[in-house]
């Protein structure tokens, strides 16, 4: 459903790059546009409760921190170049493919105006195609993505000693 506000004031796009850091495709750059208002960076911690009989509550015990998660809606528009948007969308989803040498998807870097996150692409869901060319090829589309921060054990140990 389209919000009337979005019709009057179209969402501001952000332009970013996804850089492949590891594997056979290291050095590859995938340019993307995203809906700025959907850019969300979150961090979570895990806590457990400690059973203490006779109390009106439960004491919490910190268990571990979780990696940061970056979510957003990517926007694809092929109207200016007469491009079927399924091609650039598949370039993004291909970043989830397992690298045969590493036996895992590649580590990436999401980069946008001074912000950089070393990550993996955890989830990519094609939400919709918004319009099409006369021959039926989709000309605009959106995809919801989630990146999970990727740090090595050594990086996490060094980081925990600094705090």
Q: Locations of the language-model features?
A:
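Acidic, Ser/Thr- and Gly-enriched intrinsically disordered low-complexity segments
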Residues: 1-163
């Amino acid at each position: 459903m389209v919000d009337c506000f979005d019709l009057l004031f179209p969402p501001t796009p952000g332009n970013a790059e996804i850089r492949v850091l590891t594997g056979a495709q290291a050095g590859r750059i995938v340019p993307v546009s995203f809906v700025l208002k959907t850019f969300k960076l979150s961090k979570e911690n895990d806590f457990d409760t400690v059973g203490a009989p006779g109390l009106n509550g439960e004491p919490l015990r910190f268990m571990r921190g979780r990696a940061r998660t970056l979510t957003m809606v990517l926007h694809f528009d092929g109207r200016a170049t007469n491009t079927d948007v399924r091609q650039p969308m598949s370039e993004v989803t291909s970043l989830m493919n397992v690298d045969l040498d590493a036996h895992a998807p590649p580590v990436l870097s999401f980069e946008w105006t001074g912000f950089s996150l070393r990550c993996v692409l955890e989830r990519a869901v094609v939400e919709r195609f918004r319009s099409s060319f006369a021959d039926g090829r989709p000309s605009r589309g959106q995809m919801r993505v989630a990146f999970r921060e990727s740090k090595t054990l050594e990086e996490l140990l060094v980081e925990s000693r600094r705090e």
